[in-house]
Amino acid sequence: MERSRVKYGLLHNHTMESRRDSAMSVQTLVDRAKELGAPAVALTDHGVMTGYIDFARCCEEAGIKPVVGVEAYIEEGSEGRKHLILMSKNDKGFRALSKFTTDTQHRLANGFARGNKELLMRYFGPGSEGHGNVIATSACVQGVLASIVLANRSVDDDINKLREQQDG
């Protein structure tokens, strides 16, 4: 039975450059993407872009489009850090993403580089080099967007409990 091919790129991937998250090498990631027939694959390590040179080389050798990105940690007040995937669309986006990631390294908390809304606006907001040149997506259940959904779910649960108490 032939394995089905991936029609789109694999866009949320970590390698051993991601602290405490993956033991996979860049080569293994690219080999797996090729095996699945993916036309593109993204490298979105946590808080760093240190593997992008090997990644680009491996992708070129495999005939796969490399998408360079990062899974950034964004400060959310006292709630700790939220995750946000940022991927460069082109050279301008790559430069902005590199500068953003470098600046987050100066803002460590518990060993993790952290960005904030100010840095996001500086590098990706209107009038910046990265504006329109970087794609942002929710990362995981700890992501910026997922946290909004989960917060709304919590509010909905509270409303339903109140209704049950009123009806009971």
What is each of the regions a protein language model found here?
Residues 1-168:
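Phosphodiester-processing cores and adjacent nucleic acid-binding clamps
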